[in-house]
Curated annotation (Swiss-Prot):
Major location (coarse): membrane
Stretches the record annotates as Kinase-interacting sequence (KIS): 101-178
Single GO term (MF): ATP binding
Record protein name field: SNF1-related protein kinase regulatory subunit beta-1
Biased composition (Low complexity): 43-60
Comment, domains: Kinase-interacting sequence (KIS) is specific for the alpha catalytic subunit interaction and Association with SNF1 Complex (ASC) is specific for the gamma non-catalytic regulatory subunit interaction.
Lipidation (N-myristoyl glycine): G2
Organism lineage string: Eukaryota, Viridiplantae, Streptophyta, Embryophyta, Tracheophyta
Region (Disordered): 1-63
Function comment: Regulatory subunit of the probable trimeric SNF1-related protein kinase (SnRK) complex, which may play a role in a signal transduction cascade regulating gene expression and carbohydrate metabolism in higher plants. The SnRK complex may also be involved in the regulation of fatty acid synthesis by phosphorylation of acetyl-CoA carboxylase and in assimilation of nitrogen by phosphorylating nitrate reductase.
Region (Association with SNF1 complex (ASC)): 215-283
Compartment list: Cell membrane
Length: 283
């Protein structure tokens, strides 16, 4: 049968070629030269003809450019490259890392249980999945406080075991506080706490009577460290303390002569100036 089909095709091709030739001959008045001019050139003549020859036919392998067209899709088929989210468990289109997973559970019976809340301005109602006697749903919500209510078999209800609030009309809805939970780990903050003071470093003994009988010091111990009575090199290298500024000091008996030295130290910005006045001791 394959050979028969091949013969039929060859015959059809031959007959088609004969029709073209005969029609061309008739249109040119039966001129043999015209018949030869309208005869299809062979592959050899096409290869030998110059590129600009009018007898050269266009190559069958050259196609016109086509504009890419989007593939057809069925009405019930999802669009290509589209990530399907579980709408019963996702309220927002945000990725999971931008929200906090939150589970709402209803365990007080009912066949058809749904929930609606302020996370989407009460626009949608999500159905809870039943597992045994409980109904639950998972939301991925941003941090914040939301109000919601449970619809059980078409009747609005709330969970009494969880925080709830009622409005002026008497409608009651639950409160959902969504926030990031950081578990407390006392061991992680021990190194930041100050070490406790030893108990033996403190006492509650009251001062004795002899402590009150002591006379106070005439001059504080800091005022004994003055520039008077020191060597010149030590006085230049030592920076005066702030407690000795603007105080007049007197030094006696530091020389064999009977001379009294009076000293006063001032500070001007970062510089210290000490003025020493020598006066003979009067008798």
């Amino acid at each position: 049968m394959g050979n028969a089909n091949g013969k039929d095709e060859d015959a059809a091709a031959g007959s088609g070629g004969a029709d073209v030739t005969s029609s061309s001959a008739r249109s040119n008045g039966g001129d043999p030269s015209a018949r030869s001019r309208h005869r299809r050139p062979s592959s050899d003549s096409m290869s030998s003809s110059p590129p600009g020859s009018p007898a050269r036919s266009p190559s069958p392998f050259l196609f016109a450019p086509q504009v890419p067209v989007a593939p057809l899709q069925r009405a019930n088929a999802p669009p290509p490259n589209n990530i399907q989210w579980n709408q019963s468990q996702r309220v927002f289109d945000n990725p999971p890392e931008q929200g906090i997973p939150t589970i709402i559970t209803w365990n007080q019976g009912g066949n058809d249980v749904a929930v609606e809340g302020s996370w989407d301005n009460w626009r949608s109602r999500k159905k809870l999945q039943k597992s045994g006697k409980d109904h639950s749903i998972l939301f991925v919500l941003p941090s914040g406080i939301y109000h919601y209510k449970v619809i059980v078999d078409g009747e609005s209800k709330y969970i009494p075991d969880l925080p709830f609030v009622a409005d002026e009309v008497g409608n009651v809805c639950n409160i959902l506080d969504v926030h990031n939970f950081v578990p407390e780990n006392p061991e992680s903050i021990v190194e930041f706490e100050a070490p406790p003071s030893p108990d033996h470093s403190y006492g509650q003994t009251l001062p004795a009577a002899e402590d009150y009988a002591k006379e106070p010091l005439a001059v504080p111990p800091q005022l004994h460290l003055t520039l008077l009575g020191t060597t010149e090199e030590t006085a230049i290298a030592t920076k005066p303390q702030h407690v000795v500024l603007n105080h007049v000091f007197i030094e006696q008996g530091w020389t064999p002569q009977s001379i009294v030295a009076l000293g006063l130290t001032h500070r001007f910005e970062s510089k210290y100036i000490t003025v020493v006045l020598y006066k003979p001791l009067t008798r």
